[in-house]
Amino acid sequence: MFIFKRKKQVEMPLEKIPAHIGIIMDGNGRWAKKRLKPRVMGHKAGMDALQEVTIAASGLGVKVLTVYAFSTENWSRPDDEVKFIMNLPVKFFDKYVPELDKNNVRVQVIGDTHKLPKATYDAMQRACLRTKHNSGLVLNFALNYGGRSEITNAIKEIAQDVLEAKLNPDDITEDLVANHLMTNSLPYLYRDPDLIIRTSGELRLSNFLPWQSAYSEFYFTPVLWPDFKKDELHKAIVDYNQRHRRFGSV
């Protein structure tokens, strides 16, 4: 059992640590605007926040941390911003992977990665290769990821198996669909997030893990992502500890 010490408050036990946490990292641009800085500086600060949160989650015993790094819809942003964001994984992996490796963190990526710029793709591959034998927390980047696209592709794969008589339609189950989703590479027990956190005060999923989040608990905070550090993660988990997950039952 972990003990979280809140400032000027009593110690709060963390008896339930969510095995899989998903984070929609939102608010980088607004963080920069408040400080009269270019939007790209908010993305850079967000990268530093991710490193701190990852190490904190690993220390708490979280098994999987899935972070929404870049959606399929984000390509519509200004070209200069997209170019900068695409370079962030290169900087993140080069700067922080040695420390993540020391903490037994394994890096993994889901999304349509073949459409990424070569430098981004290569940096991603290097990070995954370096950490592939680690047995600790899985840092799962959703990069060029879209939930509806993921489900659509799963349906196409299953339909093709039916067309080729490899599969009977009556044999299609929820587990079968899940096995065709990008999260099928995660440990079976941890594929679906127990807790999804969204920063910046927005109250929506934005196409993030729509299938996998069916029974997730949600935590929305007005804190902008670059300001979401170790203490904010603890607050989210304290809130999670106060929930009673019923999974549709009473």
Curated annotation (Swiss-Prot):
Source organism: Streptococcus agalactiae serotype V (strain ATCC BAA-611 / 2603 V/R)
Residues annotated for Mg(2+) binding in this entry: D26, E217
UniProt-recorded Gene Ontology molecular function terms: ditrans,polycis-undecaprenyl-diphosphate synthase [(2E,6E)-farnesyl-diphosphate specific] activity; magnesium ion binding; manganese ion binding
Cofactor comment text: Binds 2 magnesium ions per subunit.
Signal peptide: none
GO biological process: polyprenol biosynthetic process
Binding site for substrate: 27-31, 39, 43, 71-73, 75, 77, 198, 204-206
UniProt similarity note: Belongs to the UPP synthase family.
Enzyme Commission number(s): 2.5.1.-
This protein's GO CC annotations: cytosol
Keywords: Magnesium, Metal-binding, Transferase
Cofactors, names only: Mg(2+)
Protein name (Swiss-Prot/TrEMBL): Isoprenyl transferase
Function: Catalyzes the condensation of isopentenyl diphosphate (IPP) with allylic pyrophosphates generating different type of terpenoids.
Disulfide pattern: none
